[in-house]
Regions:
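RNase H-like (RuvC/DEDD) metal-dependent nuclease/polynucleotide-processing core
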Residues: 1-4, 8-233
Length: 233
């Protein structure tokens, strides 16, 4: 079983952490893919990035693509004002409200890019996952902070507050993830921990994972709501 995971960045391709995880829950091997090695440079473009992720996933036999970023907007009928249900249940700091409304406002670029990337992946045959998922290809919204929490591990702080990722490399090893290189970056570690839910899904199904939110749905021009999925220990 193979999954492809991205800790997403919208300003520079090189800031994206990209990881392949192969194996099964409790015993997996990691491969880090650098933007440079993939021929990516400059400012990310959703269509270009989606096409490349599709090509990598097909070549490597991955059935799931995970992105650390929002997949849609808040539903019109939601009782929540500023965020989607999955963000509320995951205590996510970034919040997507009605179309175009993002909190904090400085996160708007990232939110728009992420939603556009989910849309582009959908066009390549990677629809947003639903609770009725039955093993087919799908795109999944991840949240590494929630992944660490649901595994019972202290979440890794932001890049500027993390002088060394070695403690979290050790946590990954204890979870059965092998071949995480000593040169791994903060964003790559986050991509790896987020990927674990993909192996759990492929091995045991939707009911086995930590699922926050509700099924995504299309409302006019926009996708709304969606699941944030994390591994469950």
């Amino acid at each position: 079983m193979t999954v492809l995971s991205v800790d997403l960045a919208s300003r520079r391709y090189r800031d994206n952490g990209i990881a392949l995880l192969r194996g099964r829950w409790g015993h997996a091997r990691c491969e880090i893919l650098s933007a440079d090695a993939l021929g990516l440079d400059g400012e990310p473009d959703a269509q270009t990035f989606a096409a490349l992720l599709h090509d990598v996933a097909v070549r490597e036999g991955a059935r799931l693509i995970l992105l650390d970023g929002p997949q849609g907007w808040r539903a019109e009928q939601s009782a929540l004002v500023h965020q989607r249900r999955c963000e509320r249940e995951s205590l996510a700091p970034g919040k997507t409200g009605l179309p175009g409304v993002v909190k904090p406002a400085t996160w708007t670029r990232m939110a728009l890019f992420s939603i556009a990337l989910f849309d582009a992946l959908h066009a390549h045959g990677w629809p947003r996952i639903t609770a009725a998922w039955n093993g087919e290809r799908a795109a999944i919204e991840s949240f590494p902070t929630q992944a660490w929490r649901s595994l019972g591990v202290p979440a890794m702080p932001g890049r500027a507050s993390t002088p060394s990722v070695d403690p979290w490399r050790a946590h990954l090893a204890a979870l059965g993830v092998h071949d995480v290189p000593s040169t791994v970056t903060h964003d790559e570690v986050q991509a790896v921990v987020a990927a674990l839910v993909g192996l759990q899904l492929l091995g045991a199904g939707f009911s086995a994972v930590d699922a926050r939110g509700c099924d995504p749905h299309r409302d006019g021009e926009h996708w709304r709501e969606g699941w944030i999925l994390s591994p469950r220990r």
